[in-house]
Regions:
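Accessory cap/linker subdomain of secreted extracellular hydrolases
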Residues: 124-194
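The serine-hydrolase catalytic nucleophile loop
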Residues: 37-47, 218-219
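Serine-hydrolase catalytic core
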Residues: 165-249
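Alpha/beta-hydrolase active-site loop
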Residues: 72-92
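Short beta-strand element of the alpha/beta-hydrolase
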Residues: 27-35
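Conserved alpha/beta-hydrolase
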Residues: 51-68
Length: 260
């Protein structure tokens, strides 16, 4: 089984010395995925800039869960959008690919690691777990409506719902398929299911902020425990809250990438 290693902010990963045959940073492509209601210029911007300054090839696309897009596309579409980002990095010379996500982006990165071969997936303060009880209660009526519409062949029909983001919420409307994909406990973003389906040999780094809400800490830990035994998994703690976790994780992510 996997080895669990808890470290603190700005410390090096245990045993993460750079192997003699490790690729140069400019041969590692990194897709950085922002969190819910975020954007590439939000909480993940500093991390993306730090990785670029260390020589990594980095792209940070705006994803369907951004504040502007409001879940305009579902899971299959966001996988395709990450595919496009990977193609861009490959064209620039990337030989290895890692997906680094924050919050909702972390859960999406985990999903991507079940759908495509990647060298690594880093999950920073993973959030947006549709299988958690709070989400089940909040989104159940919208999920039921969306399921009925999709069953009628109306996947693009809009569904209204109250969207949760920590202690904040917004009233939104999104296509039925998107509502199912993001909020159905049995849908494609169930992090427990995806953890068990990560492709063998994929490096998975879980970054847990010490000031995270208790419920999210428990969900992240449970997700980590369900990772496929063949995944190369590791954990790091950073001294930060949920939104500041990407900045606090800069050193840990940089060192982990160098060890791919």
């Amino acid at each position: 089984m996997k080895s669990v290693r808890w470290l603190f902010a700005l410390t090096l990963l245990v045993g993460a010395g750079l192997p003699a045959n490790a690729p140069a940073a400019d041969k590692i492509g990194v897709v950085v995925l922002h969190g819910k209601w975020g954007s590439p210029d939000g909480h993940t911007r500093g991390l993306a800039k730090q990785l670029e300054s260390n020589g990594f090839l980095v792209t940070s696309p705006e994803m369907p869960w951004s504040r502007q897009r409001e879940y305009d596309k579902g899971a299959a579409a966001f996988v395709a959008e990450i595919d496009a980002a990977v193609t861009e990095l490959r064209a620039k010379g990337a030989k290895k690919i890692a997906v680094v996500g924050h919050s909702q982006g972390a859960v999406a990165a985990l999903r991507y690691a079940t759908q495509r071969p990647v060298d690594g997936a880093a999950l920073i303060a993973a959030g947006g777990h549709p299988q958690n009880d709070r989400f089940r209660d909040n989104y159940s009526s919208a999920v039921a409506e969306a399921r009925a519409l999709v069953g009628q062949g109306k996947a693009d029909a809009p569904v209204s719902f109250n969207d949760l983001n920590g202690d904040r919420n917004r009233n939104l409307r999104a296509p039925a398929q998107s509502v199912l994909d993001y909020f159905d406990p049995d849908g494609p973003l169930n992090s427990y299911v995806n953890a068990a389906r990560v492709r063998p040999g994929t490096a998975v780094l879980l970054i847990a902020p010490t000031q995270e809400a208790k419920s999210l800490k428990e969900l992240s830990h449970s997700t980590y425990e369900k990772l496929a035994p063949a995944a190369k998994s590791s954990q790091v703690e950073v001294d930060a809250d949920h939104v500041k976790a990407p900045d606090a994780a800069k050193m840990a992510v940089t060192d982990w990438l160098r060890g791919l």
